[in-house]
Amino acid sequence: MKFCKKYEEYMQGQKEKKNLPGVGFKKLKKILKRCRRNHVPSRISFTDAINHNCSRECPVCDGTFFPELLKEMEDVVGWFNEHAQKLLELHLASGFTKCLTWLRGNSRKKDHHGLIQEGKDLVNYALINAVAIRKILKKYDKIHESRQGQAFKTQVQKMRIEILQSPWLCELMAFHINLKESKKESGATITSPPPPVHALFDGCALTFDDGKPLLSCELSDSVKVDIDLTCSICLDTVFDPISLTCGHIYCYMCACSAASVNVVDGLKTAEATEKCPLCREDGVYKGAVHLDELNILLKRSCRDYWEERRKTERAERLQQAKEYWDYQCRSFTGI
């Protein structure tokens, strides 16, 4: 089955259960077909591609294809982030909050299996839309003999509406593993329903390649998502992980150091000019997200390392806190 038909059937099945946004795959392909008939082949510079300044013979770039795709991507990422955050907040909530949810009659979320299935559905939704976007941009480049699709993807990443960059995708993958592991530890039998016919996502795994941790999941469409869990600052497994708005993951204390802030003040006080150590993008610290599910997963999977790192970080945080309050005291007394 061709991906377009597979995607349309998947989205149709989802919309019967809940009204959720998607990529207008068929509509965008029709735009490209018209472009194929009218397009005069010509090479377009990479700079022009970023600015979307195509030749006039190409009706696709004349305020049609990219604006339409951009709006759909914003809707997809916005819906995914909102629902993923709600699900994760429910899982990490106190017993009282969970009790209120149960009393309100949200039967799907109140049981263990319901949480697993909803998390799996959200990851599947994110991945199948990511594949749809990748394929339609690849088709665009093929028809135009250009790199505009790749340039658009780069621009979207800078705008932070690339779904694979979402910290909530990483959190959902860790959440999925955590729930399955806790089910095993409790000794309960895991009875999962067969995967949907058109599902791409078949589960996640935390793997170690030469001691380096990777959070990964396989797609049936020959695409693999790997999230490197090695902090590029301390070159060790991320501890108390945090995701910057550019999508890169660091230890919380390493991120504070890179942003030139004290752990007492936190990343919210970072200057807008401070840049990500990897991509050098600025303004990425204030919207950083704590990866609590990933923190739980790594704590469970790397017990010895976690305990050793916890002791080291505790001593360092206490030292930083002491220096911070000593400085505040001296400033107040004028000494």
Curated annotation (Swiss-Prot):
GO molecular function: ubiquitin-protein transferase activity; zinc ion binding
UniProt entry keywords in alphabetical sequence: Cell membrane, Membrane, Metal-binding, Nucleus, Transferase, Ubl conjugation pathway, Zinc, Zinc-finger
Keyword Membrane included in the entry's annotation: yes
Phenotype when changing residue 181 to K: In bah1-9; loss of activity
Catalyzed reaction equations: S-ubiquitinyl-[E2 ubiquitin-conjugating enzyme]-L-cysteine + [acceptor protein]-L-lysine = [E2 ubiquitin-conjugating enzyme]-L-cysteine + N(6)-ubiquitinyl-[acceptor protein]-L-lysine
Domain SPX: from-to ranges: 1-154
Pathways per UniProt: Protein modification; protein ubiquitination
One cellular component (GO) term of this entry: nuclear speck
SMART domains: RING
Phenotype on disruption: Plants show a low-nitrogen-induced early senescence phenotype and an excessive accumulation of salicylic acid after pathogen infection or application of benzoic acid.
Pfam families: zf-C3HC4
Outcome following mutation: residue 279 to A: Loss of activity
Listed EC numbers: 2.3.2.27
One GO BP: plant-type hypersensitive response
Other remarks on this protein: Is the target of miR827, a Pi starvation-induced microRNA.
PANTHER family registered for this protein in UniProt: E3 UBIQUITIN-PROTEIN LIGASE BAH1, E3 UBIQUITIN-PROTEIN LIGASE NLA
Domain notes: The RING-type zinc finger domain mediates binding to an E2 ubiquitin-conjugating enzyme.
UniProt subunit comment: Interacts with UBC8. Interacts with PHT1-1 and PHT1-4. Forms homodimers (via RING domain). Interacts with UBC24/PHO2. Interacts with NPF2.13/NRT1.7. Interacts with NAC92/ORE1.
Protein name: E3 ubiquitin-protein ligase NLA
Source organism: Arabidopsis thaliana (Mouse-ear cress)
